[in-house]
Curated annotation (Swiss-Prot):
Positions annotated as propeptide: 1-7
This protein's name: ATP synthase subunit b
Subcellular location: Cellular chromatophore membrane
Membrane topology: Single-pass membrane protein
InterPro entries to which the protein is assigned, alphabetical: ATP_synth_b/b'su_bac/chlpt, ATP_synthase_B_chain
GO (cellular component) term, any one: plasma membrane
Membership in a protein family: Belongs to the ATPase B chain family.
Subunit structure: F-type ATPases have 2 components, F(1) - the catalytic core - and F(0) - the membrane proton channel. F(1) has five subunits: alpha(3), beta(3), gamma(1), delta(1), epsilon(1). F(0) has four main subunits: a(1), b(1), b'(1) and c(10-14). The alpha and beta chains form an alternating ring which encloses part of the gamma chain. F(1) is attached to F(0) by a central stalk formed by the gamma and epsilon chains, while a peripheral stalk is formed by the delta, b and b' chains.
Membrane-spanning intervals of the chain: 24-44
Organism (species): Rhodospirillum rubrum
């Protein structure tokens, strides 16, 4: 826009400038040159500051992007770690459950075996007690039979045998008794 105004002014005063000493004698020319120099100077000075600010801002944005990328990578690594831990925990829980089931089955089998052994032991004890009771009953019956037989023999012999014969028969029966009881 300024160059259009300058061109228009130069065109207006162009005839005058040419007649009085040319382009270098025209104040508009020098104003335009001065203006361009100021703009160039400001551009050079401001360019470094603007570019520096833009570079700084770009570096800050890049740093933030790098940090965000690093945070994302860290978050993904952490997520992967927690997922791995969860899988490991699930495997461990499954292993614990399997072990508990195996242990329960083993304990149940042991309890059944112990119960069966206990039942067999009690049956054997009952059979032993019955056999012992039978043996005692048989021994009592034998003793009773012997006592009755001895008593009957004594009463029969007492009436029909002499005292010396009675004693001899009793001694013979007593000597014979151990062989007959077994």
């Amino acid at each position: 826009m300024i160059s259009l105004a300058l061109a228009a002014e130069t065109a207006e005063h162009g005839g005058e400038a040419a007649s009085h000493g040319g382009l270098f004698a025209d104040p508009a020319f020098w104003v335009s040159i001065a203006f361009l120099m100021v703009v160039g100077f400001v551009y050079i000075k401001a360019k470094n500051k603007i570019l520096g600010a833009l570079d700084g801002r770009g570096a800050a944005v890049k740093a933030k992007l790098d940090e965000a990328r690093k945070l994302r990578d860290d978050a993904q690594a952490l997520l992967a770690e927690y997922q791995r831990r969860q899988r490991d925990a699930m495997k461990e829980a499954d292993e614990i459950i399997r072990h508990a089931k195996d242990e329960a089955a083993r304990l149940r089998a042991k309890a059944e075996a112990d119960l069966e052994a206990s039942i067999r032991r009690r049956e054997q004890q009952a059979v032993d007690r019955i056999a012992q009771a039978e043996a005692q009953a048989l021994a009592q019956v034998r003793n009773e039979a012997v006592d009755v037989a001895v008593s009957a023999a004594r009463s029969l012999m007492a009436g029909s045998l002499a005292k010396a014969d009675q004693n001899r028969l009793i001694d013979a029966a007593i000597a014979d008794l151990p062989g007959k009881l077994h």
